[in-house]
Amino acid sequence: MHKLISTEQAMMDRYVTLKNVKTGTIDYCFDRSDFPEDKYPGFYFMEIGGQYECKIVLFGSLASEEGPNTVRCRVLDPDVMIGNCRFVKVGVGEDVYYVYHFRVKDGLANGRFLFRCPRKDLIQVDDVVLSEFYKYEGLWE
């Protein structure tokens, strides 16, 4: 469960600041849901101070050593579908995130990997999934 702390409008999208109510972790996330469609509403229903079940994807790539923006991930579930896209559910400390499967498939063998994460993206709020994950069958496998 996350609490929406703030939003910041950018040119064609926005950033949201979320606080994990269980762990206290603050996540600054990119929100690309600015083009809602009838079938796929965006995340603009979120209100400051409201609490929501959020899924956040770590955007980046496998890392061979620790460095800036690098996190230690432990695999919680190696195969999760969100919309039509395949993800790996990971734990970073006590927090749960998602990583595109195709970006880490070579690092899943021992159940842990380093991941360089310069950005976090909000991909699901409650039952609303970012529309692009339904539009393209098989994308990001």
Regions found by a protein language model. Name each.
Residues 8-10, 20, 46, 82, ...:
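A generic structural signal for short, solvent-exposed coil/turn residues
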Residues 16, 53, 88, 98-101:
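Compositionally biased, intrinsically disordered low-complexity regions enriched in proline and serine
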Residues 17-21, 87-93:
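Short, acidic/hydrophobic/Gly-rich beta-strand patch recurrent on exposed beta strands
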